[in-house]
Amino acid sequence: MAVGSMNVEEGTKAFPAKLTGQVFLCCVIAAVGGLMFGYDIGISGGVTSMDTFLLDFFPHVYEKKHRVHENNYCKFDDQLLQLFTSSLYLAGIFASFISSYVSRAFGRKPTIMLASIFFLVGAILNLSAQELGMLIGGRILLGFGIGFGNQTVPLFISEIAPARYRGGLNVMFQFLITIGILAASYVNYLTSTLKNGWRYSLGGAAVPALILLIGSFFIHETPASLIERGKDEKGKQVLRKIRGIEDIELEFNEIKYATEVATKVKSPFKELFTKSENRPPLVCGTLLQFFQQFTGINVVMFYAPVLFQTMGSGDNASLISTVVTNGVNAIATVISLLVVDFAGRRCLLMEGALQMTATQMTIGGILLAHLKLVGPITGHAVPLIVLILICVYVSGFAWSWGPLGWLVPSEIYPLEVRNAGYFCAVAMNMVCTFIIGQFFLSALCRFRSLLFFFFGIMNIIMGLFVVFFLPETKGVPIEEMAEKRWKTHPRWKKYFKD
């Protein structure tokens, strides 16, 4: 049964573009990979602020946290503690590389299954961890799950969705990331006062992994992946099922042509880096992920409880503040889901950059003026104002760079280098997330509130990047992206031969 029907944007081939129940179900199930990712992002900051967790694994950090005269900005500065958060993303880089080959050779569906299995085993290992080695080992397996999932899920959704609805359906991945973050912050709040509560928090990661594992048995492989692997008839059958119509020849032929070009490419990475036509999507896709991480968002997502405790909030108050922030994150992502295929990508990205710049600069100014090296901020007004500003900042990210940092790289590459190109985007995400996770607390200790001004300047730079270098991609079939967008862009057309 069709949920809706509309032709794609004028100027592109008029593929029938029904949004069927089959497509919607496949996209929702696949997007649970975002729930896994979000849960992990949200859980680590709360766990690392729990006294029971610090006593079990980082007693020296616990002691430093409770010193009366400890520098406010340096309470949690510890390389091993930061490695607990960041080790996952280091593993994710390697896993994404492997996944790009697995996905091309065996398909998107089995790769998504593997992601859920890695994540499930990692969650069980963390739940039962008795020493730091087990804890880090579990994080590495979680990293493999995240690497496989983040590499494959957005591609899966982009390939299975009609062009007219691709943006909104892909935003579901980011929406479930925000739901995962919100769920994790609430779980941390509930478990923070329990003995060994950190085990329940970390073990909770098994829930989204199980949902994805079971759900992956009910999704279709993408037609593009089937046809790319020589299964033309199966690809045609799946295309009819997910489109809900018999007349799929036009779209099938377009995919078939793209796969014929793709199968001639024996070394996708060599093709990606040596062919001039691939340079525009490579630069834009990779830089979008770089900028997404250097908005400063994971400073808030990883370490929000730590930041609120740094300002003098108690453990419970800091966790409640985090729940509020993450609730705003989820609500704002819904706005993106509703407007992304109407407003377009560029408009949201530029507005988000402006909103985040203003709030980061203001937060930096407030902390510079009011948070001294020793002792909490006096009164409740300043922490409340900072909380409101963080909510405004998070909403700006959630309806722009959050979902679109994943969506745009998944829709701009030609099929022959799509896995390789998207790997570069995911790898950039993992590298930058590792850097933030591993070094932010140390940077906070050294640069203090000036760090927020740094992120504000980065937001200005990325807004200018969108203005001058990123084409609008809404409503354009992936197979036509080069012809309709890159070849006509004033700064990128020189890379295409006539």
Curated annotation (Swiss-Prot):
Mainly localized where? membrane
Family to which this protein belongs:
Belongs to the major facilitator superfamily. Sugar transporter (TC 2.A.1.1) family.
Question: Its topology with respect to the membrane?
Answer: Multi-pass membrane protein
- Which cysteines share a disulfide bond? none
GO MF annotations in UniProt = monosaccharide transmembrane transporter activity; symporter activity
Q: What is this protein called?
A: Sugar transport protein 2
Organism the protein comes from: Arabidopsis thaliana (Mouse-ear cress)
Q: Biological process GO terms, please?
A: monosaccharide transmembrane transport; pollen development
Keywords attached to this entry = Membrane, Sugar transport, Symport, Transmembrane, Transmembrane helix, Transport
The record's InterPro entries line, in alphabetical order, gives: MFS_dom, MFS_STP/MST-like_plant, MFS_sugar_transport-like, MFS_trans_sf, STP/PLT_plant, Sugar/inositol_transpt, Sugar_transporter_CS
Q: Does the keyword Membrane apply?
A: yes
User: Could you read off the lineage of the organism from its UniProt record?
Assistant: Eukaryota, Viridiplantae, Streptophyta, Embryophyta, Tracheophyta
